[in-house]
Amino acid sequence: MAILRAKEIRGMSDKELDKQLKDLRNDLLKQHAISATGGAPENPGRIRELRRTIARILTIKQEKKQKEMKR
């Protein structure tokens, strides 16, 4: 899964964001499990990338929610 940029995330619907968030969280869980069992991850930067992408999605969802509340 590629890195999602803020522009791409803003173009997604709420359902797409929820699905993407669920997929990323599952992937992060798998990566943590691999490192916790002592295995070497294929890409050590992947965990950081996943955490940042999840944070981007949550931030943009919150921005959209606040915009709707102001209307």
From Swiss-Prot:
A Pfam match: Ribosomal_L29
Gene3D superfamilies in alphabetical order: 1.10.287.310
Gene Ontology terms describing biological process: translation
Keywords: Ribonucleoprotein, Ribosomal protein
Coiled-coil residue spans: none
GO molecular function: structural constituent of ribosome
A cellular component term, taken from the record's GO annotations: cytosolic large ribosomal subunit
NCBIfam families: L29
Similarity comment text for this entry: Belongs to the universal ribosomal protein uL29 family.
The protein, known as: Large ribosomal subunit protein uL29
